[in-house]
């Protein structure tokens, strides 16, 4: 048994080759009245299926794509259709072979001399081919096509060019490209959004970003899941041929991955501008397939509102009818399901960005940097650098032993090399002012001995460094032990253009002083979020039980 491979990353119907079978040309059967008879002439298989000696092919069908042709079923009722003997070992268990419908020759896929279908829910789950149905599939079993391929197959030139040599290559686990199929509508009655005056079809483009160095705090990659999909599109440019109120763009699960922070922001914590989707174009999706509206800070530039349809929420038939041949292929982690879709409301009066000029300038800048680095390159081998935890705050104390949670440094230059950005010293001006005020109230003439004065001048200062992930309570306790502490930036303000140093220090001071209040507020926000989720869950459980439109079962 050989498994199917992907044809250049294009989404094709899942298929299996089973075994070789010989058929007599005179074998026919009468077509009876049936409730499922699809038109499969346009179903094209990878080239390996036509070149193999295994003639029986099984293919999973989708009811929303391969619909029942009622007129053909009524017309061909009573006609003689070609048939073949189904091997007993083809399906395990008891299979209702009397419900298998052999199809007329004109409705069979190209390259088949006989074949038929099991309708939706006809095959038991234990008898359905394991490789053609997901383990978590719910509802009735999908329809299944079982056909007998011809000994000598001659495909037309269009199918040959479409297949190419993609079927001869083994399948890989890398990201695949989802490509939409062209629809057969004429421009006059076409449903494609490219021909509409109310919508525009955009291309989601990401500017190339320079590679970032490895972080000393590597984050665990988020597992691939499609129960929720909320990408960050703030740095994504939408390329459109014409400006319209609404624009539609295919997204990529590789270039636009799911961001958990965006998902938390959409759960009622931030305001998400919404708009009404036209019902004549977009289907009514409820529950887990509903469109997710994004907050303003995660939208592309120039958009007032936007929503995301997660992967597999829209049917392939919708993409065929409304996107068609104008869809730009995007790399996907899973090409067996439909890609995610962005629908955005464009801001009126926004000036379009000359994206091509911006891309050209970005490429020229990167080329000049690479050329300069090549000129300055030396033959000396670089020593491997072990990523270390960056410093955060250097503290000047009079005690040789560093505070709890800190470590010693020799100089401010070492602190700067470590990555310290804040310098904390004991504020001497306040003590001098208090002493002067006390002497004015109670004048005492005391002569300072030269030895004591020399000891005060020669008093040594010790430097202690706190890491960026040090305990904030330990940092605050060390500053409290100093008495009156003064915070300053270690670097000069001239070296930080565009940074409000005073405001940054003031915000750090507020965090250190009000850390308890910040923690209580964050805890209260989490408790409020838990309460909202529990309330919504209880409201959902109180809803009346209805029949699911996807699987036909009661939920």
Swiss-Prot record:
Residues 430-441 have a biased composition (Basic and acidic residues). InterPro entries: DM7. Residues 430-458 are annotated as: Disordered. Belongs to the DM7 family. It comes from the Eukaryota. Keywords: Repeat. This is DM7 family protein GE17493.
């Amino acid at each position: 048994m050989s498994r199917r491979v992907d044809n250049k990353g294009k989404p094709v119907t899942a298929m299996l080759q089973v075994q070789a079978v010989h058929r007599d040309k005179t074998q026919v059967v009468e077509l009876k009245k049936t409730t499922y008879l699809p038109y499969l002439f346009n179903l094209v298989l990878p080239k390996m299926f036509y070149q193999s000696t295994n003639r029986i092919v099984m293919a999973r069908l989708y009811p929303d794509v391969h619909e029942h042709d009622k007129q053909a079923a009524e017309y061909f009722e009573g006609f003689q259709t070609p048939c073949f003997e189904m091997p007993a070992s083809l399906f395990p268990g008891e299979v209702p072979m009397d419900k298998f419908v052999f199809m007329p020759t004109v409705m069979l896929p190209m390259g088949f001399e006989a074949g038929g279908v099991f309708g939706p829910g006809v095959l038991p789950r234990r008898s359905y081919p394991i490789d053609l149905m997901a383990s978590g599939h719910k509802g009735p079993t999908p329809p299944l096509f079982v056909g007998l391929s011809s000994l000598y197959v001659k495909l037309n030139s269009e199918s040959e060019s479409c297949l190419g040599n993609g079927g001869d290559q083994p399948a890989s686990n890398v990201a695949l490209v989802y490509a939409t199929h062209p629809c057969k509508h004429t421009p006059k009655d076409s449903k494609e959004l490219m021909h509409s005056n109310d919508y525009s079809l955009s291309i989601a483009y990401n500017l190339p970003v320079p590679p970032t160095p490895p972080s000393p705090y590597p984050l665990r990659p988020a597992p691939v899941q499609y129960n929720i999909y909320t990408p960050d599109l703030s740095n994504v440019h939408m390329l459109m041929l014409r400006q319209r109120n609404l624009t539609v763009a295919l997204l990529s699960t590789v270039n636009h991955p799911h961001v958990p922070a965006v998902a938390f922001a959409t759960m009622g914590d931030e305001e998400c501008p919404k708009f009404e989707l036209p019902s004549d174009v977009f289907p009514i999706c409820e529950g887990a397939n509903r469109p997710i509206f994004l907050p303003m800070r995660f939208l592309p530039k120039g958009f007032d509102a936007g929503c995301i349809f997660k992967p597999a929420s829209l049917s392939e038939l919708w993409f065929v009818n409304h996107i068609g041949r104008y869809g730009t292929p995007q790399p996907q982690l899973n090409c067996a399901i439909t890609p995610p879709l962005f629908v955005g409301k464009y801001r009126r009066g926004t000036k379009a960005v000359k994206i091509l000029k911006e891309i050209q300038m970005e490429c020229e800048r990167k080329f000049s940097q690479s050329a300069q680095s090549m000129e300055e390159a030396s033959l000396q081998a670089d020593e491997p650098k072990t990523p270390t935890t960056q410093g955060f705050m250097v503290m000047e104390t009079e005690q040789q032993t560093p505070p709890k949670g800190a470590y010693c440094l020799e100089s401010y230059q070492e602190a700067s090399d470590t990555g310290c950005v804040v310098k904390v010293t004991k504020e001497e001006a306040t003590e001098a002012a208090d002493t002067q005020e006390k002497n004015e109230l109670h004048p005492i003439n005391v002569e300072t001995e030269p030895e004591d004065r020399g000891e005060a001048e020669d008093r040594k200062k010790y430097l202690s460094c706190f890491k960026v992930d040090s305990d904030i309570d330990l940092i605050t306790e060390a500053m409290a032990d100093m008495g009156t502490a003064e915070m300053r930036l270690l670097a000069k303000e001239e070296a930080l253009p565009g940074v409000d140093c005073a405001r940054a220090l003031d915000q750090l001071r507020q965090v250190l002083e009000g850390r308890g209040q910040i923690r209580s507020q964050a805890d209260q926000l989490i408790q409020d979020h838990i309460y909202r989720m529990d309330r919504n869950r209880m409201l959902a459980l109180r809803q009346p039980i209805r029949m699911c439109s996807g699987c036909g079962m009661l939920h």
